[in-house]
Amino acid sequence: MSEATALSPAEFEQALRAKGAYYHIYHPFHVAMYEGRATREQIQGWVANRFYYQVNIPLKDAAILANCPDREIRREWIQRLLDHDGAPGEDGGIEAWLRLGQAVGLDPDQLRSQELVLPGVRFAVDAYVNFARRANWQEAASSSLTELFAPQIHQSRLDSWPQHYPWIDPAGYEYFRTRLGQARRDVEHGLAITLQHYTTYEGQQRMLEILQFKLDILWSMLDAMSMAYELNRPPYHSVTDQRVWHKGITL
């Protein structure tokens, strides 16, 4: 039985981009935010829970760096850490997200405490970081390729939120504006690594599954938020109105 023929680089890239049909921009929770149907509580809940994702992205990127023996790749990939953590003496994406939190009426200390992070969101983000730690560096790096679709989602927020939510301080949109350029730059690097590494049919199919795994993470995060903030069914809602869920277990 002959082996399946590998996709050409152009065909493989097209298959990767086709996964954009499952990007979380199409999740009902995000659609509601884009269309102006989200409440203040729902937007605050989204900002608070996405903060957990933001603070873990540098850990994901640090894991990739730790597993990567290629000096030139490390030199370029480390920029992602600086984008989020900030270079010495400079703010990064995490501080920009804290300012977004303030813009929607959240206290920075409450965001940092992670007390609002839903278990479903925590589990999804932790799964992503653990994957990056355990996978080979090429697979972990290419799992970031949901960035292919990120500029569209950042632009959609910049286009719609000021119109629909005048109560949000416009200064909070700095994160989205900054990420527009950073995401496009990161896509070029991540896509180059991916197209170079996956040259067999089996490898390409595995990469498509890895990208779907990342899409599942982003979608599942919004599922958890939808349960809590749209359906008013947060964890343990049937037995208490208190946030009794765990706030993170340090190992």
UniProtKB/Swiss-Prot annotation:
Organism domain of life: Bacteria
CDD domains: TenA_PqqC
Family annotation (InterPro entries): Haem_Oase-like_multi-hlx, PqqC, PqqC-like, Thiaminase-2/PQQC
Enzyme class: oxidoreductase
Coiled coil: none
GO biological-process terms attached to the record: pyrroloquinoline quinone biosynthetic process; sulfur compound metabolic process
Biological or metabolic pathway of the protein: Cofactor biosynthesis; pyrroloquinoline quinone biosynthesis
GO terms of molecular function: pyrroloquinoline-quinone synthase activity
A Pfam family reported for this protein in Swiss-Prot or TrEMBL: TENA_THI-4
Catalyzed reaction equations: 6-(2-amino-2-carboxyethyl)-7,8-dioxo-1,2,3,4,7,8-hexahydroquinoline-2,4-dicarboxylate + 3 O2 = pyrroloquinoline quinone + 2 H2O2 + 2 H2O + H(+)
Family designation: Belongs to the PqqC family.
Protein name stated in the entry: Pyrroloquinoline-quinone synthase
Organism this protein belongs to: Pseudomonas syringae pv. syringae (strain B728a)
Lineage, broadest ranks: Bacteria, Pseudomonadati, Pseudomonadota, Gammaproteobacteria, Pseudomonadales
